[in-house]
Amino acid sequence: LGKTAGVLHGVLKAAYRSHRRIYFATARTTQQRIVEETIQRLAKQGLPIKAVSIRARDKACLNEVVACRPDCCRFAHGHHDKVRQQQLHERLWQETDGVIRVPSMEDVSEASSDAVVCPFALSMALCREADVVIGDYNYVFDPTRRIGPIAESPGEWIIVVDEAHNLPDRARGYASPALHRSTVEEAWMGLSAVPSYVGCADLIAEVR
């Protein structure tokens, strides 16, 4: 935790001085957990900070099939109303003795399951209010996956790249088109779940 705490201390000072927010980009889930734990320790020392971790849509999804439409996913149906009615943002960032909770990916998933809302959409909404967002390289460096707050106002963010030596290979992958069988399978499953897209699913089935 020492190295991570040292990095966070310096970048938080810079962020507060310049009124910016922080995206902590990692290549591994294990490192995300270390950052979560470090921020929680800083919060317990009295630092007023809101942080959230995000994970990939397909890994976060609680539905049987990744199909983000209210007509085929009960977690997407009425999502925003349920989040507001159950005050999920406030609950996940609940203060105890003046210390703001730092919700883990599991905390977001559990709260989403209980409230029957989409955990991915919930984490994306939390990103808009967070001082620190912890997530994969993809959500800042991949133009097709960059999260809204960074895409809309890149100058308002400080980007911390953990294990930056891994970034060149990942970046080359962003610019190297490829179609994997798993992607085709995922597309087929998603389209098959939506009645109006069954015809498209049948076309994909021919090349599976």
Sequence positions of predicted segments:
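Secondary-structure transition/capping motifs at alpha-helix termini
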Residues: 16-18, 45, 153, 164
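Signature of the SF2 helicase/ATPase Hel1-core->accessory helical subdomain module
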Residues: 33, 37, 115-132, 137-208
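A substrate-engagement module of RecA-like helicase motors
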Residues: 19-133, 138-141, 184
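A generic secondary-structure signal for well-formed alpha-helical elements
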Residues: 15, 42-46, 168-171, 195
